[in-house]
Curated annotation (Swiss-Prot):
Location of region: Disordered: 96-122
Gene designation: ARP1
Keyword Flavoprotein: no
Protein's organism: Arabidopsis thaliana
Major location category of this protein: nucleus
InterPro entries: Nucleotide-bd_a/b_plait_sf, RBD_domain_sf, RRM_dom
GO cellular component, one term: nucleus
Keyword list, A-Z: Nucleus, RNA-binding, Stress response
Phylogenetic lineage: Eukaryota, Viridiplantae, Streptophyta, Embryophyta, Tracheophyta
Induction per the UniProt record: Down-regulated by abscisic acid (ABA).
Pfam families: RRM_1
Protein name, entry field: Probable RNA-binding protein ARP1
Length: 261
């Protein structure tokens, strides 16, 4: 048995006699490979290629037979089991077939529209945030109808509510026990709608609209009825003053004046 490390060898033309053996275990020695292929014919050389620095097997080697018929018989079983592991072999002149790791399947992608993937649907919907003690079912039972600020008529403008043209927000103001404050927003963005919510107890509710800037409403406890509106103006007549009748005697003469209303 020849076990030279000279892969090129000096055996003349080995185009039909040299067999490539790949997929070997790392601990496979050339003696184990020789013992497997000796049954096909005389072997001139059997080598396992190893790393020059670590001297560790690279997992493949070569077997050179004495005649081409032996090499052909050895390649009939292209996936032999050597040293307890399935290997692969073929003529070295055809090129080595190193065993590759199984191809990883690419993750499934969502439905595509032509060559472009369909983006997820993003709707212009409002997102609600509830304070503690306020459930989603309570939110669904309420009638979310867009109304002006807490029942005030649209024509009403609070005297202490100012609008800053440069910043673009409505200043904070107290309205019938409520305190409303808007965060600054660019003028080009539409103002969010306001919804009628009656909530008891302290807390903060965030009403989101299709705008990155979200208004904040701080709700204070109140004990008024839900129907909130303007107090009806009441007018009263001026108070009238009356003087009692005056009677008496002046200089012996009796005088009497009537009451003035």
């Amino acid at each position: 048995m020849t076990t030279s490390n000279n892969v090129n060898g000096c055996f003349g033309d080995t185009k039909l006699t040299k067999v490539f053996v790949g997929g070997l275990a790392w601990d496979t020695h050339k003696e184990a490979m020789y013992d497997h292929f000796i049954k096909y014919g005389d072997i001139l050389e059997a080598v396992i290629i190893s790393d020059k620095l670590t001297r560790r097997s690279k997992g493949y080697g070569f077997v050179t037979f004495k005649d081409a018929k032996a090499a052909t018989r050895a390649c009939e079983d292209s996936t032999p089991i050597i040293n307890g592991r399935r290997a692969n072999c073929n003529l070295a002149s055809l090129g080595g077939r190193l065993r590759k790791s199984p191809t990883m399947t690419s993750p499934q992608q969502g439905p595509k529209n032509g060559n472009r993937a369909t983006p997820p649907h993003v709707g212009n919907h409002s997102q609600w945030y509830y304070p503690s003690g306020f459930t989603n079912q309570q939110h669904q039972q309420q009638n979310h109808q867009a109304v002006p600020f807490y029942g005030y008529p649209s024509a009403y403008v609070a005297p202490n509510m100012t609008f800053n043209q440069k910043v673009g927000y409505v200043g904070g103001t107290y309205m019938n026990g409520y305190y409303a404050q808007m965060q600054p927003q660019p003028q080009s963005q539409p103002q969010p709608q306001y919804y009628h919510h009656h909530m008891y107890g302290g807390g903060r509710v965030m009403v989101g609209a299709a705008s990155p800037m979200v208004p904040f409403y701080t709700v204070y406890p109140y004990h008024q009825s839900q129907a909130i509106g303007f107090p009806q103006p009441s007018f009263s007549k001026p108070l009238s003053f009356s003087t009692p009748p005056i009677s008496g005697t002046v200089g012996g003469e009796s005088i009497q004046k009537k009451a003035i209303h």
